[in-house]
Amino acid sequence: MVVYGHTPELFGGALAQAIVNAGKARTDLSIPEAFIRGILCNILVCIAVWMSFAAKRVSGKLMTSFWPVMLFVLCGFEHCVADMYFGVAALLTSAEYGIAAEGLTWSHFLFSSLLPITLGNIVGGAGVVGVGYWLAYLKHTPYAKETVEEEQKELDIAEEY
């Protein structure tokens, strides 16, 4: 919508050039760098989500979400959802307005940028934050083990009938 709504034509085409430059900068990362930036980003995003769950008021939810997200933006970390916008906007703007950007192709964007960032986001969110919370709160909880065992007994009884 942004590209085909002719928004990049604003400011004499400078906005189109800025969109392409932003997308190109995101796709110029090496695969390990993109992966690590993805891990660090989603650690902060997941912490923001968990902190907002802990807050009771809307103002607390907003404030606890704001700071980690602001930090990941300031640090230049990468999130796959943001990359889906910036990369696609850059590719479409480049094609629509004829702005040359060496190395900015769909395959390079998908496999050298979006894939490692997405995998990094998964590792950061599920691997670091998820496992961290499990180790901190659920690993040594006898209730969780008993609940699973009780559910398994109920399933075994149900299978007998």
Task: Identify the meaning behind each predicted range.
Residues 1-161:
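Alpha-helical transmembrane segments and their helix-helix packing motifs
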